Amino acid sequence: MKPSSPISLTSSSIARKARFSPYLFTLLAFILFVSVLYGEDFMCIFGQLEPNFVLPPSRTPEKNKKSEKLAFAIGKTEESCDVFSGKWVRDEVSRPLYEEWECPYIQPQLTCQEHGRPDKDYQFWRWQPNHCDLPSFNASLMLETLRGKRMMYVGDSLNRGMFVSMICLLHRLIPEDQKSIKTNGSLTVFTAKEYNATIEFYWAPFLLESNSDDAIVHRISDRVVRKGSINKHGRHWKGVDIIIFNTYLWWMTGLKMNILQGSFDDKEKNIVEVSTEDAYRMGMKSMLRWVKNNMDRKKTRVFFTSMSPTHAKGIDWGGEPGQNCYNQTTLIEDPSYWGSDCRKSIMKVIGEVFGRSKTPITLLNITQMSNYRKDAHTSIYKKQWSPLTAEQLENPTSYADCVHWCLPGLQDTWNELLFAKLFYT
């Protein structure tokens, strides 16, 4: 279609189109309202679509902005400050934020020093945004904010690692007889009795009901997700004040995903195959609907953590074929690096679904910054749940865990970003 000249509109042509103006005005007003009110959080998502995407500074005059103060916010960041865009800086003074031996809550799958990792280099890196500084993590402020409240991480084992990291960052300020941790099925609850506060983790790798919902036995190759079933888990999330969702890796079983239409109790199950992107889109829409129906935007905060990268293919960063995260002690220095495991098609789905939603939700855009950290995985330095074979012992790359992260380590920075976005919008 040939574009119209910018000066070709005559008074008659304007008159002919005048009957459309109310609809056009309404549409433009709505777009402007959403972009101003939630622009920061949604645009973080769009920035994720391309690793080198840089958000332009807002040109909207401050006096014309219609802002809504988010719950728990105590300040604002500079408009030019994108805390998710930056570089890793060596810091042996303020890192690590705690020692592995100081935190008894770290699971044996994440205690790399205890399981023989010979170096500590991965612990001495601090995230430095390009145009600003991250606010220092203030454990006292976090605990006082959580007084009488519930914070919950919902998702898979990567979100569980972030949950454990938060406990490690806070527990030293709580007297020994005033804290406890208990697991019941999918729910693990850390209680700070003195503060009448809980920090919780709920196992739901797809957020929706699935055949992988058992918190212990869930290694199922033929995964099935039930459509429209988020309330199966969501009833356990009601009443939470701060909630952090994640879901990604469990959807990545190939190009297709099995979706159950009906119930797992049906004798004849109606299971259909859909593209991974369409299945993930269904999950994102379900999550946003649940948030809209169950979270009070004036009193609560909702976060979504973007995909956590793996480093299973050394050729991605110029390594040898067959190489992975095993024995990696240096960072990836290419600022544009994007691992092949991070599907841009999925990030596009997130951008589309979140961008069309009016539900306020803050994206924790940890993907790019974590892409550089091939050194920070647990690798072989973790508890092995079954005896290693002679073949595995001869080839450590064959059983290296390039999904999960050592603690203390990278996931402490994820919580620093959560702290920054919670208190400084």
Curated annotation (Swiss-Prot):
Its main location: Golgi. Expressed in inflorescence stems undergoing secondary wall deposition. A motif (DCXHWCLPGXXDXWN motif) lies at residues 401-415. It is found in: Golgi apparatus membrane. Keywords: Golgi apparatus, Membrane, Signal-anchor, Transmembrane, Transmembrane helix. Residues 48-425 are lumenal. GO terms for biological process: plant-type secondary cell wall biogenesis; xylan acetylation. Residues 1-26 are cytoplasmic. Pfam families: PC-Esterase, PMR5N. It is a single-pass type II membrane protein. The chain crosses the membrane at residues 27-47. Belongs to the PC-esterase family. TBL subfamily. Contains 2 motifs that are conserved in esterases, but it is unlikely that this protein belongs to the catalytically active pectin esterases. This is Protein trichome birefringence-like 33. It comes from Arabidopsis thaliana. The gene is TBL33.
